[in-house]
Amino acid sequence: MIKDMIDSIEQFAQTQADFPVYDCLGERRTYGQLKRDSDSIAAFIDSLALLAKSPVLVFGAQTYDMLATFVALTKSGHAYIPVDVHSAPERILAIIEIAKPSLIIAIEEFPLTIEGISLVSLSEIESAKLAEMPYERTHSVKGDDNYYIIFTSGTTGQPKGVQISHDNLLSFTNWMIEDAAFDVPKQPQMLAQPPYSFDLSVMYWAPTLALGGTLFALPKELVADFKQLFTTIAQLPVGIWTSTPSFADMAMLSDDFCQAKMPALTHFYFDGEELTVSTARKLFERFPSAKIINAYGPTEATVALSAIEITREMVDNYTRLPIGYPKPDSPTYIIDEDGKELSSGEQGEIIVTGPAVSKGYLNNPEKTAEAFFTFKGQPAYHTGDIGSLTEDNILLYGGRLDFQIKYAGYRIELEDVSQQLNQSPMVASAVAVPRYNKEHKVQNLLAYIVVKDGVKERFDRELELTKAIKASVKDHMMSYMMPSKFLYRDSLPLTPNGKIDIKTLINEVNNR
């Protein structure tokens, strides 16, 4: 069991100083280097005499210097706020306004001029590393101190800073490295794809650093070139793949993404969005011997609260795959609209309790009070997700409360419509979105469709293709759920975190 994240890293700096902690296309950094560099950066940060425990914004991409800076800030007693280099300036400004960081560390060139907050550049970080300053840890992040603060998008467009403490992080990390579903090996070789500003990244760096493994990162200029990206990934000796299912779907566009070309890849960890039956089935075809682990959880409950190994039997028998057994230390309940606990098999809102639940949103007491509460004497969080628990305590997902719509008198779950369309043998990916009238009522349903290779060529007109897709799903899809219009695309937009960008599609059909 891990009791302190930094203690674990320091231990590996002693026992395996020359073992790589970070690898970017063969450019490696070792555990010994990480200790020396983070010590020097921590000493430099202390010299700035920042307000104790004040948060620090760190701007950059998937680089070693980001990782070293995070470790240094933890040593010096400051929570870090990771902000990705691709973030819009308006979002960065909103985060700064809410978080009021005592310092900005710009590992990449910072796009804004901010009055009243000191900015440290990469050259200053490099100079600090060259100084090789020794460091004695006397005030590092501990217990309920914030370890990191990740900003989510927020339904109103105003970002919310989720505060994750050291104790929260330990609850997640110890579960992940000890749980049989994940089956994390010693010295794991992990693909580091999701950006640090997305809490799915914690699923790769926390167990890797806790078990003395290696993070395989990709340069930011490669991420935009999908063909080159997946050609490169196929050449990496990664054993564990952590991403959203959408990113894996993109990877499967490359013929090289298969067990024959990537024999070292034995584990897939998915979180961040729903893993569909079709994606899991395709993965089993590409990687017959691999383990596929489906995890679920909101950022507010520290990355994930449940996980389960997906089997071929599940793929054959479930319409929507189960999302796991809840963590032993995080009792998970299903409640109705009145907050009453529901029995096994009954569908309601998923709430999570226990030591992984965040203390709330940074400097946002109103939103904190809406989402966080106490249930059965434990800190609890309203996930806003619909679900149920089986008698065997397996969590089943039913969609988002805020993606439910009322149409033609029926209450419809948009994700359910998408799932049904994805069952078509002609469909590679599908998303259902509502079109609203002037009274803000749903006028009709539309579907964005990416068809499988070779499908379009079989039809002279899109109308014929649409009829064929509808016919292929009509036996298991209620007629009132069927979208009235199908829009065909070569690909669907993704958020910077690798999820299908449903909000952008909704705005597109409603001309927002």
Curated annotation (Swiss-Prot):
Top-level taxon: Bacteria
Gene that encodes it: dltA
Leader peptide range in chain numbering: none
Source taxonomy: Bacteria, Bacillati, Bacillota, Bacilli, Lactobacillales
GO biological process: lipoteichoic acid biosynthetic process
Protein name per UniProt: D-alanine--D-alanyl carrier protein ligase
Cellular localization per UniProt: Cytoplasm
Enzyme class (EC, first level): ligase
CDD domains: DltA (cd05945)
One Pfam family this sequence matches: AMP-binding
CC terms in the record's Gene Ontology section: cytoplasm
Pathway this chain belongs to: Cell wall biogenesis; lipoteichoic acid biosynthesis
EC number: 6.2.1.54
Ligand binding (ATP): 152-153, 294-299, 385, 397-400, 499
